[in-house]
């Protein structure tokens, strides 16, 4: 076998490092050029809005109905440049024009109020942000009534807000946002059940949203426990608290399960619903059971989904898509990205292929790198194992039975400085 020699091997590794460094610098340069062009375009857009506003005010007055849209666009342009104080002033001016022209409780204020809420949140003014959203909510109640189906998107936006704040807070502080989100989800569920037909196109999405929220709450309780009130308590024993947390977690399992069953019912009632669509949401319910340790119920649910696929135009293709290989189970509500402008990092584009064994119960083990040329530090491997060991997978299903299977996934290296 050819032996490169120690000095040649070191030189080869050094050259690879130089090449990687050069490529990284090129990516940085392209990013900076692109960012500079975007910033110039944003500045030009702002100037265009300001000129249009001046012209319109000069011709039609300071409260022309056309001005509010221009102020909304101006505010969004300022926000895209993170010039939040200017954005806030533009949104508030646009809202004032709407109120003067259409009344204090006009629905046309809603996009301005939600934009104000987003901007106040970006400025760190969470109380003012929530106040703006509550104003939008009360205006909708005034116009529609508290249980009208048109309230569902409004409630959903409030849940979004609380979940974004939850992800920014320490667990103990953020729990109050989960409590508020659950109350809102209960209101949403009531409206969906009582006032909206099952064939409502957005119904499955909103019911799934409720399930996702209950997973977040149950997961929070599992990881951090329930907050204990200071002062008088009936019992402070560890066993008592654990029993309480188990009961609470089961409550959220049950409510999430109920919501997913509604997803199934609503999906069946949708126009042009296919067997694959129905099997897909039934499989999601199986995933839910598996996440909460209900393995037998999960298998029965997967089997039902598999039976539904017998009615599909291409049953084997559909089976391969849903059950041909393990799939990581994902429930929850993630933080919405406020700023999509990012600089490339040296680690960002580096990923590795990881092979693992997925058991019949969806548990991952036996991790190793599928590509021999890839490498991870001990700490990176520790983080990898911790990440995938904390996940559950939908198992491979063959002839309606779960099977142990090898699974290969792409895994992004953790950011530098992340500790296990």
Where in this protein do the model-derived segments appear?
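Charge-biased low-complexity segments
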Residues: 65, 118, 144, 160, ...
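N-terminal signal peptide c-region/cleavage motif recognized by signal peptidases
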Residues: 31-33
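TPR/Sel1-like alpha-solenoid repeat signature
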Residues: 70-78, 90, 112-120, 132, ...
């Amino acid at each position: 076998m050819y032996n490169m020699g120690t000095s040649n091997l070191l030189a080869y590794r050094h050259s690879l490092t130089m090449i990687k460094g050069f490529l990284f610098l090129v990516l940085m340069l392209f990013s900076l050029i692109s960012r500079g062009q975007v910033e110039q375009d944003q500045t030009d857009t702002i100037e265009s809005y300001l000129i249009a506003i001046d012209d319109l005010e000069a011709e039609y007055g300071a409260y022309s109905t056309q001005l509010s849209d221009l102020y909304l666009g101006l505010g969004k342009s300022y926000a895209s440049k993170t010039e939040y104080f200017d954005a806030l002033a533009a949104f508030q001016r646009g809202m004032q024009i709407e109120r003067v022209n259409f009344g204090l409780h006009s629905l046309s204020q809603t996009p301005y109020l939600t934009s104000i809420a987003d901007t106040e949140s970006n400025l760190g003014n969470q109380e003012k942000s929530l106040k703006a959203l509550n104003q939008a909510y009360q205006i909708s109640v005034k116009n529609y009534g508290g249980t009208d189906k048109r309230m569902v998107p409004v409630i959903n936006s409030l849940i979004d807000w609380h979940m974004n704040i939850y992800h920014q807070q320490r667990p103990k502080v953020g729990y109050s946002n989960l409590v508020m989100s659950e109350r809102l989800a209960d209101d949403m569920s009531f409206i969906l059940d009582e006032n909206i037909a099952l064939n409502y196109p957005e119904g499955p999405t909103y019911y799934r949203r409720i399930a996702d929220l209950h997973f977040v709450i149950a997961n929070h309780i599992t990881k951090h426990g329930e907050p204990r009130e200071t002062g008088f308590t009936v019992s402070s024993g560890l066993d008592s608290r654990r029993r309480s947390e188990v009961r609470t977690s089961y409550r959220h399992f049950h409510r999430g399960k109920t919501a997913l069953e509604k997803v199934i019912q609503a999906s069946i009632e949708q126009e042009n619903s296919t067997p694959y669509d129905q099997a897909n949401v039934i499989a999601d319910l199986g995933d839910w059971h598996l996440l909460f340790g209900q393995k037998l119920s999960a298998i029965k649910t997967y089997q039902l989904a598999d039976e539904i696929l017998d009615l599909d135009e291409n049953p084997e293709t559909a089976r391969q898509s849903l059950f041909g290989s393990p799939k990581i189970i994902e429930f929850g509500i993630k933080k919405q990205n406020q700023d999509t402008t990012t600089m490339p990092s040296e680690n960002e584009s580096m990923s590795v292929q990881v092979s693992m064994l997925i058991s019949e119960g969806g548990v991952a083990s036996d991790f190793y790198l599928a590509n021999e040329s890839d490498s991870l530090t001990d700490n990176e491997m520790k983080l990898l194992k911790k990440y995938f060991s904390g996940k559950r997978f939908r198992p491979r299903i063959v002839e309606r039975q779960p099977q142990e299977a090898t699974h290969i996934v792409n895994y992004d290296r953790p950011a530098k400085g992340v500790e296990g």
